């Protein structure tokens, strides 16, 4: 009787209104991945190798769906964030490993967001010495007060100017036959730059922080087991939308920049890919989207990181807690923002290289988070009937193995001097 009631309740929720009402956590988490580092990585892929890296996107879309759906399902079933589940399942010592990986990866990405903000505002003539301190202060104030949630949808909307890459791709006139072939035929090269770009693409598409964000967002919405189907729709749609945009960024830059031999070294180079649609306004369009996307992620990352660490070790957390009540939570946020801003302002730093390197770090550390996630999601005692199936487990472990091998290959090729 109880199962029938739950089943009919789930069916009742599967209305258009319910589906749109459930949209948010998965969509926000996936689209937030198209941040400064994401734009830099996808643009570099197209500018450096044309369409040859498109084959990764269908694969990455499936794996993104797997990891994000797993995160959402774990949140619905347990009502807890991933950090809390890691502590309960593995204990404090292994939680230290997971949180260290998350802290390193997220700090690197936050640095890249400030690099993106500095690069974008520089296209408007605002020097980094002015833009970075002011934006860092604004990010800190919004994160500390919790008022960021009031503007996150606006920022997400503005950052969606990158949807223009879809139009720009068609206007640029790519060879669609070549696009179709490269979309399904893998291309592997024994070049450390290519391999590191593959790792960066994985890291920016399936970022560790996105997994924690997706699960926390579901928990914050008080979603339960009856909401799993709705959250799955949200996750799948968000993942597909994010990777479609990523694909068209590669197609656009592969059509406009690659044939001209233009290697992307800064934001101005990347903006040239939008000239087919925006002409002289391409710089303004690109800069607006880059700043909005970077600011969105810069506001999300410190809070996600601090919340996860405090959750893992049982410390007070939340924007509604004062410094006296949650000193570690507020201290971690302040440290991440401060360190990121200072490093970006250091003389002679390559802002574009910062954005790229952060995604490689993401990719290298991703397996650490995925191991914890897949073990938890497959645990009958934690997940019950909603534990991972065989296909989900195989895909996740395969992802872990592939990234680990790619990381080793990347470092070996660099050590041997290939591509030098």
PLM region spans:
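Juxtamembrane transmembrane-helix boundary signature
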Residues: 29, 56-90, 98-108, 253
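Transmembrane alpha-helical segments of multi-pass small-molecule transport proteins
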Residues: 97-99, 123-144, 161-165, 327-342, ...
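Loop-to-transmembrane helix boundary motifs in multi-pass membrane proteins
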Residues: 92-93, 129-134, 237, 241, ...
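Extracellular loop-to-transmembrane helix junctions
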Residues: 17, 44-69, 83, 87, ...
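Hydrophobic alpha-helical segments and their helix-loop junctions in multi-pass secondary transporters
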Residues: 160-187, 195-216, 372-381, 406-418
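Extracellular/periplasmic helix-exit of transmembrane alpha-helices
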Residues: 65-73, 77, 218-219, 240-269
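Flexible loop linkers connecting adjacent transmembrane helices
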Residues: 2-7, 41-46, 69-94, 260-275, ...
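Hydrophobic, small-residue-rich membrane helices and short re-entrant helix-turn-helix hairpins
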Residues: 36-44, 212-241, 262-272, 385
